Curated annotation (Swiss-Prot):
Molecular functions (GO terms): growth factor activity; hormone activity; receptor ligand activity; serine-type endopeptidase inhibitor activity; type 1 angiotensin receptor binding; type 2 angiotensin receptor binding
The protein's name in its UniProt record: Angiotensinogen
GO biological process: adenylate cyclase-activating G protein-coupled receptor signaling pathway; aldosterone secretion; angiotensin-activated signaling pathway; angiotensin-mediated drinking behavior; angiotensin-mediated vasoconstriction involved in regulation of systemic arterial blood pressure; angiotensin-mediated vasodilation involved in regulation of systemic arterial blood pressure; artery smooth muscle contraction; associative learning
Subcellular location per the Swiss-Prot or TrEMBL entry: Secreted
Organism phylogeny: Eukaryota, Metazoa, Chordata, Craniata, Vertebrata
CDD domains given in the database record: serpinA8_AGT
Function as written in the Swiss-Prot or TrEMBL entry: Essential component of the renin-angiotensin system (RAS), a potent regulator of blood pressure, body fluid and electrolyte homeostasis.
PTM comment text: In response to low blood pressure, the enzyme renin/REN cleaves angiotensinogen to produce angiotensin-1. Angiotensin-1 is a substrate of ACE (angiotensin converting enzyme) that removes a dipeptide to yield the physiologically active peptide angiotensin-2. Angiotensin-1 and angiotensin-2 can be further processed to generate angiotensin-3, angiotensin-4. Angiotensin 1-9 is cleaved from angiotensin-1 by ACE2 and can be further processed by ACE to produce angiotensin 1-7, angiotensin 1-5 and angiotensin 1-4.
Disulphide bridges: C42-C161
Length: 477
């Protein structure tokens, strides 16, 4: 066996071990045939009918070049348009991709929580994480491509093209997943949800990116910004320039790290996500209200409150309750609150697992007065750190084969995922239903004034778009 072959098998074994450990006893077998290369495509790839020409390349413009800001409404309209054209098979692909992204998200959320430590909060977008990894898959060659596919949780057979993920199909399905989130059936009474994704490809001068690779990321997001800057002379200054650029282009107030990076890096692949939802029938309470970070410490924060008919249930055995708040026709905010705040770590480990959706029940709605902090959550993490924590630091390290990304193999530095999640009062709207009818049960008061978990779930695809933990509404994570 060649050294390269031995290294590939060893790395894949390491990845499989990590996947199996995080999955517990679960056997992760699903039909992925809709996401694989077809036999006809494999035949074309293995026996091209025409001579393959060199792929066109380009050098990104300098980061200080004038750039038009992102139009979030246009991004949303493109997602809506793509979703309106979905056929039955497209929806099946979207459901498969959502399932894989959910599973990947739980694994990485566990790593993120462990890295953050106790009582520091966390937020993660499984689709954004998944899209980032699939983007690298599209830009990679073996052995890196096979390793990334295994990391995504999809089996690969050595030498079998038809067991390979078709990255273009996968990102198109991910586009459908995002579109189903923001498309709410055109209901005029429902405030539209907003989700925007921006990708920054920040390169060292001299690295030329391959045009087909950059274009292939279009379904993930049309808002792609390749920009060049000096990454080696002053890494801290480079990080500041990137942050200023992102702020200027998006207008989003995000938690962007200012740490310097490795001076020999030639590519940063950064993904930025903004989600904004209006809570129909909720209004902001006057003044500030106490949120208990722990038994002895409170902070004063703005609170939202609304009364309506919501689904709510308690798990008496595990001592937590769940309140289900609609954000759209198929989108739900799940608020998970332990009966005792000190149990949050235990509940987090118990609930945020691969079988999370089995915890979601469907009880009859009941009259509830719900009060919770106004959420404006900012979070960032470097995927490289999570891979290193999982002992997979070489996956996107110096030896990674990313030959489809640029004219020379890029050396990947930062792989940032940054999230801005906003849940606001929908004061201009009426409550979902009247709070209480004659003869109905008394209104239940549910107040989230201590640490809790949350998730945003879209029913049609089965996607969990966000997983998070709020320890202190004033903190970024």
């Amino acid at each position: 066996m060649t050294p390269t072959g031995a290294g590939l098998k060893a790395t894949i074994f390491c990845i499989l071990t990590w996947v199996s450990l995080t999955a517990g006893d679960r056997v992760y077998i699903h039909p992925f045939h809709l996401l694989y290369y077809s036999k006809s495509t494999c035949a074309q790839l293995e026996n091209p009918s025409v001579e393959t020409l060199p792929e066109p390349t380009f050098e990104p413009v300098p980061i200080q070049a004038k750039t038009s800001p992102v139009d979030e409404k246009t991004l949303r309209d493109k997602l809506v348009l793509a979703t309106e054209k979905l056929e039955a098979e497209d929806r099946q692909r979207a459901a498969q991709v959502a399932m894989i992204a959910n599973f990947m998200g739980f694994r990485m959320y566990k790593m993120l929580s462990e890295a953050r430590g106790v009582a520091s909060g966390a937020v993660l977008s499984p689709p954004a994480l998944f899209g980032t990894l699939v983007s690298f898959y599209l830009g990679s060659l073996d052995p890196t491509a096979s390793q990334l596919q295994v990391l995504l949780g999809v089996p690969v057979k050595e030498g079998d093209c038809t067991s390979r993920l078709d990255g273009h199909k996968v990102l198109t399905a991910l586009q459908a997943v995002q579109g189903l989130l923001v498309t709410q059936g055109g209901s005029s009474s429902q405030t539209p949800l907003l989700q925007s994704t921006v990708v920054g490809l920040f390169t060292a001068p001299g690295l030329r990116l391959k045009q087909p690779f950059v274009e292939s990321l279009g379904p993930f997001t049309p808002a792609i910004f390749p920009r060049s800057l000096d990454l080696s002379t002053d890494p801290v200054l480079a990080a500041q320039k990137i942050n200023r650029f992102v702020q200027a282009v998006t207008g989003w107030k995000m938690n962007l790290p200012l740490e310097g990076v490795s001076t020999d890096s030639t590519l940063f692949f950064n993904t930025y996500v903004h989600f904004q939802g209006k809570m129909r029938g909720f209004s902001q309470l006057t003044g500030l209200h106490e949120f208990w970070v722990d038994n002895s410490t409170s902070v004063s924060v703005p609170m939202l409150s609304g009364t309506g008919n919501f689904q709510h249930w308690s798990d008496a055995q595990n001592n937590f309750s769940v309140t289900r708040v609609p954000l759209g026709e198929s989108v739900t905010l799940l608020l998970i609150q332990p009966q005792c705040a000190s149990d949050l770590d235990r509940v987090e480990v118990l609930v945020f697992q691969h079988d999370f959706l089995t915890w979601i029940k469907n009880p009859p709605p009941r009259a509830i007065r719900l009060t919770l902090p106004q959420l404006e959550i900012r979070g960032s993490y470097n995927l490289q750190d999570l891979l290193a924590q999982a002992k997979l630091s070489t996956l996107l390290g110096a030896e990674a084969n990313l030959g489809k990304m640029g004219d020379t193999n890029p050396r990947v530095g930062e792989v940032l995922n940054s999230i801005l999640l906003e849940l606001q009062a929908g004061e201009e709207e009426q409550p979902t239903e009247s709070a209480q009818q004659p003869g109905s049960p008394e209104v239940l008061d549910v107040t989230l004034s201590s640490p809790f978990l949350f998730a945003i779930y879209e029913r049609d695809s089965g996607a969990l778009h966000f997983l998070g933990r709020v320890d202190n509404p004033q903190n970024v994570v």
